Amino acid sequence: MSEKQYKLVKCTINGEYRETMVDVRASLTDMLRNDYRLTSVKKGCEVGECGACNVIIDGECFNSCIYLAVWADGKNIRTLESLLGPNGELSDIQQAFIDETAVQCGFCTPGVIMSAVEILESGKEYTREEIGRASC
């Protein structure tokens, strides 16, 4: 059996430059949760289907459970924690989810919010049908 291999990953997470050694087989979900305690990134299906682990990487939403941590080298990563204001206040999109009772059980809500953030920040216009097809 071979020994684990590690690689230094340098990236920006929620606006802060970070460096960490990661197992080359580790997912970005594992790195964010285990190394940085970013618990908004949930482990759900671990096959890229449920969206509970969604994060924004260089402006695009990805399932972090199927994105290797080593691929994050040089990237700008945002999790739900990046949306909080300086005094912990919720962002407009987070407040809208609360106001519209769009939280369900809450487990996948952070990932759904990050998908919504990508849609809003992309500047693209989508029909309700297009958004509905992309929703879980």
Model-derived features with residue positions:
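Signature of N-terminal electron-transfer/Fe-S-associated modules in redox systems
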Residues: 1-135
